[in-house]
Amino acid sequence: MEIRLVMKTARSVSLELDDGGIYKTKEVYRILVNGDEVKTTDTVITSLYGLKPDTDYEIGVEDARGTRQGEI
């Protein structure tokens, strides 16, 4: 699977989770920010809101089995 940064603002990011699905991903993924799960998603494009400006974040993606699929 590939993870791409689609858009970044001071308080949000939009990600593309490319696992071969068109609108929906082929499975559900967990989105982690600095190691903490913040949401689950089954859509190819997903967004995270409420981020703080001038702050570094590690955004990771895991499948339902907890296998790390990538990070930004």
Indicate residue ranges for each PLM-predicted region.
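Pro/Thr/Ser/Gly-rich low-complexity, intrinsically disordered linker/stalk tracts
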Residues: M1-T25, P53, G66-I72
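Generic structural microfeature
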Residues: S12, K26, T43-T46, D56
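Alpha-helical interaction segments
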Residues: D19, T46-L48
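Short beta-strand elements bearing conserved aromatic residues within extracellular beta-rich modules
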Residues: E27-I31
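Predominantly extracellular/luminal cell-surface or secreted proteins
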Residues: L32-N34, E62
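Short beta-strand segments within Ig-like beta-sandwich modules, predominantly Fibronectin type-III
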Residues: D36-T43
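Beta-strand-rich modules
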Residues: L48-R68
